[in-house]
């Protein structure tokens, strides 16, 4: 198998460190991608996971990150407009959300949320986990899907909010809620998927999760190598396995 093109890029100094601020929906995909990149390139990756909105705020305030992998392109464009980035970045994935229901829950894994509506009326639903829509793109899309289904107003008192989509998925599967609206990329990870059942919510029920990444100003060569690596076929194959739609190489 050919090494990714990034193996030699920017590698004149025996490998550097790249600090990657990444949306939490990427957690499991990046746990596979980082070791591959490190082995191929000689660079090291320091990964900081969080909600895109919180990471954006940290970068805007001068946090020393080199690459920003956002779940919502709007945050990348804001940083570009503020002169914090090399360019306007590139689309690296389209994400999806769905309803995750843990084993033993009284809810059905129904992507059209009809059972959720019934459970709200008949009292089966006590708590539903979503990411905080104030700063997590996956939470905002969950809110839009619940609005589309006509459930948002009534379900708000039952919501338990995760700081980011990874925490929302923990709430959704740990028994602290009867279910949750989570990223498909997390539900497809075996360590999450085995905890329950998952059903995709129709993509046209919410704005797209247009995930964009950008190299930040003054980043070292290792940051560019990471960007190149993520556009390689090997990387795209891993992203697809976690349910992401990825641009053609």
Where are the language model's segments positioned?
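Exported/periplasmic ABC-transporter solute-binding proteins
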Residues: 2-63, 70-73, 77-85, 91-95, ...
């Amino acid at each position: 198998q050919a090494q990714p093109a990034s193996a030699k890029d920017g590698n004149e100094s025996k490998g550097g460190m790249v600090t990657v601020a990444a949306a939490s929906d990427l957690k499991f995909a990046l746990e596979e991608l980082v070791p591959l990149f490190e082995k191929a390139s000689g660079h090291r990756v320091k990964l900081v996971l969080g909600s895109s909105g919180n990471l954006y705020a940290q970068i805007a305030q001068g946090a020393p990150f080199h690459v920003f992998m956002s779940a919502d392109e709007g945050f990348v464009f804001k940083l570009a407009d503020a002169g914090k980035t090399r360019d306007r970045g590139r689309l690296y994935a389209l994400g999806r959300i769905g309803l995750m229901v843990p084993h033993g829950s009284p809810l059905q894994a129904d992507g059209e949320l009809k059972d959720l509506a019934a459970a709200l009326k008949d009292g089966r639903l006590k708590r539903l986990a979503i990411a905080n829509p104030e700063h997590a793109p996956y939470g905002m899309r969950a809110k839009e899907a619940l609005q589309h289904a006509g459930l948002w107003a009534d379900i708000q008192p039952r919501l338990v909010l995760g700081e980011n989509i990874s925490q929302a998925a923990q709430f959704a599967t740990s028994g602290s809620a009867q279910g949750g609206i989570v990223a498909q990329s997390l539900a497809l990870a075996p360590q999450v998927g085995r905890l329950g059942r998952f059903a995709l919510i129709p993509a046209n029920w919410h704005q797209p999760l247009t995930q964009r990444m950008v190299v930040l100003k003054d980043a070292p060569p290792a940051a560019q190598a990471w960007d190149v690596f993520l556009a390689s076929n090997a990387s795209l194959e891993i992203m697809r396995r976690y349910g992401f739609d990825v641009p053609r190489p």
